[in-house]
């Protein structure tokens, strides 16, 4: 058979099982077969479950039958519950969104009005907390009712007894920070209690009654203030992050909540120096624009200059630029001079380079002669950033000399090493213990901007806000554990002692304002911040302080009322003594001229005294007390004097005991600050001061009754001195007595008339600087010797033996 004509099969060879097309077709057929088998299996499984589900759902389906009312009721109730749940969740979500919106508005606010509006709206959106869990409502309410009852009865003695018996700062835990957190205002009950106590204190201060004398009122206020305690503002370190303190202090100044005791270290000491050397009007004007120019770091220069400075001085920056800036800010004032001018207590912490010397808190009691700019420079000398500094002070002549000069009697041994000081935040960032011991401080407001502390405190606040009280307790436990381990390192003397000392200190106070620093701010921590960066940090400080105003007012309100009452009473006492002195002088002047011989010695005029080297007239010591308060006190006293016919009893007690932090409201306080320097610290000088003080307590009637005997005694004495009218006597000390140096009135008036004419009513009495004025001449018993010129100087030596 011929097969040559059969069809060819070469064209079908491309779809064979070994080709790509053939394999693709085979895979497709197999895949479709597998899907079909899987579909049948799934169908069988679903059919099985549907059969079982029908059996299970048949009772529930029967409940939905129209003839079954129970089933319909269950269905409707379930649907209503689900709808209500959905609605409540939606309302909560909307409320949370609104709270987040107002919080963002608070974080972006630039003025207190904007912030307070956002805080008020946030308070409305926030669920109310149960205040009974945070403080003793019953105790505070009962105490408030008792105070109101005693005030309505009108017994001043009962009011004083009640407040002296039980007036504490944290009554019933009403100063709990958790209670005031996120609040715009103080809780109503606590505000009523603070207002009631303040009202009764002012009522005691202003009431004119014979039941209570002015001296008794002042003693009551001083004792109550000492028992109540003081508030101090502490500013931490933080290099350029210290611009945060600007906003904190500015907010406290604007709301008149700035404490009179302020202390700090490192960059915080710079802000303390600004506050402690300016009067209240100067401080208010400082924050209006001049604070933008705070640039304390010099230009680092090139890499070779920086390396050379590090190799020679051990520091990156040159400290002379910082010293020059601080001199301009503080005007070469010492701690004592700043205290005399402003009435504020300034504290600056420094650490010694010596291993066994403890850190110090410099203030007007521990180091009155140290120059403030020197202390601030030493407190800013962080190792590696600035070199350690030597403290400078003023000597008796006013020259700036080393505070701890090397002393060695044997020249062969060589001079001792210089005592240098560095950053106080290394060992004592917040000098709480020292302030408690020296100034009776029991409440601290802390502004924390340290880069190694602030992040942990912010984290702890976040944990407390998100995790509740239990999480807050765990965070507190972790903090205590870290401090405990660091203290163990310090006690055992292990390596890294300096690092351990940074974390072993106290970080927080009763009210802690923590800086929310950003990462970009940490990168520029040792550089001069620009004006924009200073403004940003200051705004952060203001917003963080606005959040704490409620708790600060709760802690600080009664203390402010006590300070105001003490200031007003001291002002009234000065007016009273001035009026008594004027009345006594008027009575003496009305007597015959021949009887002025001894009476002239009874006038003790301290307003024209010759200030000693360490005594500056305080013209701005009223602090944050408004001028209208003092004016009201003056009007009140004038009303008292006119109504009583100027027949009030004279007071001869010129030495009262005050607490250590009294701001020297009474100029008669017998301490170093009012003693006129070393020459007036002897027993002889004290006897002479007591003698002159007793002269002021003599009544005109007693003077007239004893004039004849006194004139005879004066004429029979062989030791006398004649002083021309208008001249003044300055006290001095010798080896066996004291010396009175005569100063011509013409020279003194040329130097003192402009200042005295402006501040004569504000300068308090100081019995340490003595002036004896006489219409004709002054006579004092003792030995006298004339000067070589005969009219330039007169010396009187009196033997106390």
Swiss-Prot record:
It is found in: Lipid droplet; Membrane. It is a multi-pass membrane protein. Residues 753-765 have a biased composition (Acidic residues). The chain crosses the membrane at residues 232-249, 261-277. This is Triacylglycerol lipase SDP1L. It is an enzyme of class 3 (hydrolase). Residues 233-436 form the PNPLA domain. It comes from Arabidopsis thaliana. One of its GO terms (biological process) is lipid catabolic process. CDD domains: Pat_SDP1-like (cd07231). Glycans are attached at residues 130, 328, 332, 605, 620, 649, 653, 708, 759. GO terms for cellular component: lipid droplet; membrane. May be involved in the release of fatty acids from the oil body in germinating seedlings. Can hydrolyze triacylglycerols in vitro. One of its GO terms (molecular function) is triacylglycerol lipase activity.
């Amino acid at each position: 058979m011929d097969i040559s004509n059969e069809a060819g099969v070469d064209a079908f060879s491309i779809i064979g099982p070994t080709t790509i097309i053939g394999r693709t077709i085979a895979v497709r057929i197999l895949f479709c077969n597998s899907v079909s088998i899987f579909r049948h299996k799934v169908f069988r499984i679903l059919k099985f479950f549907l059969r079982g589900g029908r059996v299970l759902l048949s009772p529930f389906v029967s409940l939905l039958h129209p003839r079954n009312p129970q089933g319909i009721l269950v269905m409707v109730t379930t649907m209503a519950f689900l709808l209500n749940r959905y609605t409540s969740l939606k309302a909560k979500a909307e409320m949370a969104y609104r709270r987040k919106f107002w919080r963002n508005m608070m974080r972006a606010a630039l003025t207190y009005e904007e912030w307070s509006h956002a805080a008020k709206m946030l308070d409305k959106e926030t669920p109310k907390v149960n205040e009974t869990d945070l403080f003793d409502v019953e105790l505070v309410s009962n105490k408030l009712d008792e105070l109101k009852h005693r005030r309505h009865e009108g017994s001043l003695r009962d009011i004083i007894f009640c407040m002296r018996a039980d007036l504490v700062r944290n009554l019933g835990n009403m100063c709990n920070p958790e209670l005031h957190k996120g609040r715009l205002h103080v809780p109503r009950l606590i505000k009523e209690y603070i207002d009631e106590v303040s009202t009764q204190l002012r009522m005691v201060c202003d009431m004119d009654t014979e039941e209570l004398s002015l001296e008794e009122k002042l003693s009551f206020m001083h004792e109550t203030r000492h028992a109540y305690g003081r508030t101090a503002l502490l500013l931490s370190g933080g290099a350029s992050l210290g611009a945060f303190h600007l906003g904190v202090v500015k907010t406290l100044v604007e709301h008149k909540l700035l404490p009179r005791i302020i202390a700090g270290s490192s960059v915080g000491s710079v802000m303390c120096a600004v506050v402690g050397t300016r009067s209240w009007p100067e401080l208010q004007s400082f924050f209006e624009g001049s604070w933008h120019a705070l640039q304390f770091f010099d230009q680092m220069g090139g890499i070779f200059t920086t390396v050379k400075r590090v190799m020679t001085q051990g520091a990156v920056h040159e400290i002379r630029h910082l010293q020059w800036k601080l001199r301009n800010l503080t005007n070469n004032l010492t701690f004592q001079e700043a205290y005399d001018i402003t009435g504020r207590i300034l504290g600056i912490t420094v650490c010694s380079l010596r291993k066994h010397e403890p850190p110090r808190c410099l203030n007007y009691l521990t180091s009155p002669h140290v120059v403030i700019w020197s202390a601030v420079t030493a407190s800013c000398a962080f190792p590696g950033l600035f070199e350690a500094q030597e403290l400078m002070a003023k000597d008796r002549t006013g020259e700036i000399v080393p505070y701890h000069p090397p002393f060695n009697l044997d020249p062969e041994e060589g001079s001792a090493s210089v005592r240098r000081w560095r950053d106080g935040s290394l060992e004592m960032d917040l000098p709480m213990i020292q302030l408690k011991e020296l100034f009776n401080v029991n409440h601290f407001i802390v502004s924390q901007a340290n880069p190694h502390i602030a992040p942990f405190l912010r984290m702890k606040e976040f944990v407390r806000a998100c995790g509740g009280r239990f999480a807050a307790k765990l965070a507190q436990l972790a903090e205590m554990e870290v401090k405990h381990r660091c203290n163990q390192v310090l006690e055992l003397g292990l390596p890294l002692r300096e690092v351990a000392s940074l974390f072993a200190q106290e970080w927080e106070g009763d009210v802690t304002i923590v800086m929310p620093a950003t990462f970009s701010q940490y990168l520029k921590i040792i550089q001069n911040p620009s004006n924009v960066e200073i403004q940003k940090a200051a705004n952060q400080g203001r917003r963080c302080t606005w959040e704490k105003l409620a708790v600060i007012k709760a802690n600080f309100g009664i203390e402010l009322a006590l300070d105001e009452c003490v200031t007003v009473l001291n002002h009234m006492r000065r007016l009273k003594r001035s009026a008594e002195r004027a009345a006594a002088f008027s009575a003496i002047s009305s007597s015959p001229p021949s009887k002025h011989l001894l009476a002239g010695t009874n006038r003790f005029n301290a307003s024209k005294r010759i200030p000693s080297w360490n005594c500056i007239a305080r013209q701005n010591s009223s602090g944050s007390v408004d001028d209208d308060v003092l004016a009201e006190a003056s009007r009140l006293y004038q009303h008292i004097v006119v109504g009583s016919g100027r027949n009030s009893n004279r007071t001869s007690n010129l030495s009262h005991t005050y607490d250590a932090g009294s701001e020297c409201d009474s100029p008669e306080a017998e301490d170093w600050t009012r003693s006129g320097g070393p020459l007036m610290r002897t027993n002889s000088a004290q006897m002479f001061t007591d003698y002159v003080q007793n002269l002021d307590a003599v009544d005109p009637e007693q003077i007239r009754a004893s004039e004849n005997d006194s004139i005879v005694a004066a004429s029979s004495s062989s030791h006398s001195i004649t002083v021309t009218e208008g001249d003044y006597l300055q006290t001095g000390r010798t080896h066996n007595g004291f010396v009175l140096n005569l100063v011509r009135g013409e020279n003194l008036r040329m130097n003192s008339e402009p200042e005295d004419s402006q501040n004569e009513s504000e300068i308090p009495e100081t019995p340490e600087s003595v002036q004896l004025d006489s219409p004709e001449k002054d006579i004092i018993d003792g030995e006298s010797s004339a000067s070589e010129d005969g009219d330039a100087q007169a010396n009187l030596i009196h033997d106390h033996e």
